[in-house]
A protein has these predicted regions:
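Short, intrinsically disordered, low-complexity terminal segments
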Residues: 7, 22, 35, 141-143
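Sec-dependent N-terminal signal peptides of Gram-positive bacterial secreted proteins and lipoproteins
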Residues: 1-25
Length: 191
């Protein structure tokens, strides 16, 4: 019995010892592959009315106004709309209205009209070539719009041929001015 137990232990020892001695050689060119992610988030930009034009129509005398109808060319600046919302937006519209043109004593320039001659200096918007806006209007008048644009542009409008017209009239001297209200609407609605 002693012999069989010893031989079993010897066989087990050789078998177990054999497993501990075995090792495997490393491969010369191992291949391993894992994936990771590269990502970024692009936020939509904004639709913004960046700059609007002031209009200066110079000086006249009371005699000039009393004797003849007037057409005065202004010295405006650039008007600018930036649209960086991307191509899937509904478009936009730029309109304006003009208050009564009055002096410091609240005397109104009668029948004044702002004749906006708009050209696109840069961008992809559509402009209304000539628009007449009566002083004292309450509803804005469309001057430029964008529908189906890229949504990736700054749009500049040149208003250098804009005029102010009014008929001859009896008038007081003084500085006359009105408020031009620009309205940028975040939607396009054909008129």
């Amino acid at each position: 019995m002693k012999k069989s137990i010893l031989s079993t232990i010897a066989v087990l020892g050789v078998t177990l010892g054999d497993g501990a001695i075995n090792s495997y050689a490393a491969e010369a060119n191992p291949t391993a592959e894992l994936t990771s992610e590269a990502s970024l988030t692009i936020q939509p930009g904004i639709l913004n009315l960046d700059a609007v034009s002031n209009f200066n129509f110079g000086e006249l005398t009371i005699q000039d106004v009393a004797e003849s109808d007037q057409t005065l060319t202004g010295t405006p600046e650039i008007t600018k709309v930036s649209d960086y919302r991307g191509p899937n937006e509904s478009g936009w519209m730029l309109s304006l209205k003009l208050s009564d043109i009055k002096n410091g004593n609240n005397v109104k320039l009668q029948s004044a009209k702002l004749n906006l001659a708009t050209t696109r200096a840069k961008g992809d918007a559509t402009v209304t070539a000539t628009t007449t806006i009566d002083a004292g209007t309450t509803e804005p008048t469309l001057v430029a719009s964008a529908n189906g644009t890229t949504g990736l542009a700054a749009n500049e409008f040149d208003l250098s041929n804009t005029t102010l017209t009014f008929p001859k009239q009896n008038i007081n001297s003084g500085r006359y001015s009105g408020t031009v209200t620009w309205v940028l609407t975040n939607a396009y609605t054909p008129e």
